[in-house]
């Protein structure tokens, strides 16, 4: 059950950024959120995977054990969650609910499946969905293969999933090309600022 305030705040915007594995969501998101003129609060996701270089507990993710994550699932603590390549990812309801109750605009960096769930949940409420796309699938494969050392079957799973996810891009409000993280971040900041301005002016 979703808490009423989670979906009922009509003067707060929900911005979701998603895209295939390896497209650079985390890097672009960090650049966007460093801009103090972006009046958004990053909704920190929870995961069972190990931290990557430069990732900080409680800032990039809440890193937990599989046992703890599954306890949260049993308690219906997630807005959305998914399991991918052996690791869980999810958006804690309580955290998002707290931000919305405080009147904050929320920025979600979530998996594509989670974004689909969020679009349904927030239908009719202020929300912007952004899909980050790579310059080419060949470039995406290069990034995935060189980002970390993984077994070939895991890489194949990531690439297959990326194919399926890219086919869903037309479900999003905006598609942003990540040919340069700075340019992509600037485009997303412009989208957010324009949407916030419209919300302030019209309430919609």
Regions found by a protein language model. Give the residues of each.
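NTP-dependent small-molecule kinase module
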Residues: 9, 146-150, 164-204
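Short glycine-/polar-rich loops that comprise or flank the Walker A/P-loop
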Residues: 40, 123-128, 170-172
